[in-house]
Amino acid sequence: MRLNLCFLLALLPLWHSTAANAAINVGATRVIYDGANNETNLTVSNREDTSPYLVQSWVSRFGSSNQDSVEEFIVTPPLFRLDANKENILRIIFMGGKDVPQDRESLYLMNVKAIPAMSDDQKDKNVLQIALKTSIKLFYRPAGLKGSLKEAVAQVGWRAQTGTLAFNNASRLHVVISQLKLNGQLVPNAPEVLRPGEAGQLPVPAKAGDTLSLSYIDDYGSVVAAPVVHID
């Protein structure tokens, strides 16, 4: 991003740039949507002392190149002005959908894009406005889905398979990995998320009896160390 921006500014020396850096704060690192509820909320605040922002919000699919809004959720208000030192509450409403499974968790992205307003002295100039987007995970848990995230982590199976490390998430929840170690060594290219029912192999030489330690991110955004296991 920095290289691209520097290149762009080198081509446009008369332009100025402004960015919605840390001024716009999203009040959570993830959203857990309980399907038993009609909606869930997310707070967005503007920490700037003077500058307002135009804020756009929507839900998209996790892991997809298409980041357009999905039909399963609506966010209100989808577009609004957020003045300095103010906050607004986004209402996230599940609209349903035939492709949303009711026997396991589904994962989406909650997106918040902030565009800074022009100051009075910028209005008569060529100004490059930079919109920054924050995306956090949104987990939809159908009503009545049983089991905790701690139990889900315990249901992830690990075993040595022909010189690789095989895994199988037998739970109905997503397991977000913070760190994965085999015999005390970091596993390179470990998956970010183990989806419900997902199985696969990691190109790591493993053998039965090796120790595996997993740290995962819980519903509150905290990193939790799971008990060390010996792989089969």
Specify the residue positions occupied by each region the protein language model found.
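Beta-sheet-dominated interaction scaffolds and their linkers
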Residues: 21-45, 147-157, 191
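Short acidic, flexible loop segments centered on an aromatic residue
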Residues: 48-66, 170-187
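N-terminal signal peptide c-region/cleavage motif recognized by signal peptidases
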Residues: 15-19
